[in-house]
Regions:
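Basic Lys/Arg-rich amphipathic helical interaction modules
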Residues: 1-2, 58-154
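Basic helix-turn-helix/winged-helix DNA-binding cores
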Residues: 1-53, 59-65
């Protein structure tokens, strides 16, 4: 079974970001599309794993992280979890601030540790990969149903 690919427009719709954001993230090499054409009329396609990265980046920005923090966080998560794009992944992570290092720390979610951090007044950012995959699947299912019904999506 082949991997699904998304045009820039489809990826932006799926993730809930603008085409300009995708272009900026591409220019900054935060999320680089799998297939990039060259020349006039070039086509850019994002793989399923690229779209998962886009969704994670969008989420990190939506919770108030700066672009630099979100970019570092995404990179750290992708390096820490080689199965982040697996649609069956149920892994849970949290980011929290390390005051001494003045940076975000990524850890696998542990309920007791998360509660202890909250009890200390520490903010945490949960990353539930399962929820991200569900969001992407819901959008994909809607698109498929509309296409099957003969609705032109472009």
């Amino acid at each position: 079974m082949g991997e699904n690919f998304f045009t820039s427009k489809e990826a932006a719709k799926t993730v809930g970001c603008s085409l300009r954001q995708l272009q900026y993230w591409r220019e900054k090499e935060v999320v680089v599309p799998t297939i990039r054409g060259s020349g006039t009329g070039r086509s850019i396609y994002y793989s399923q794993s690229d779209v998962v990265q886009l969704a994670i980046m969008e989420y990190l920005l939506s919770v108030g992280l700066s672009f630099a923090e979100a970019s570092r966080g995404l990179k750290e998560l992708v390096e820490a979890d080689s199965h982040y794009a697996d649609l069956n992944s149920k892994k849970r992570w949290i980011f929290f601030g390390d005051k001494k290092k003045r940076s975000l720390v990524l850890k696998e979610f542990d309920r007791k540790e998360a509660i202890a951090l909250l009890d200390k007044g520490q903010a945490i950012i949960p990353i539930w990969l399962e929820k991200i995959h569900q969001k992407l699947a819901i959008y994909s299912d809607k698109e498929t149903n509309l296409k099957n019904a003969g609705v032109d999506l472009v």
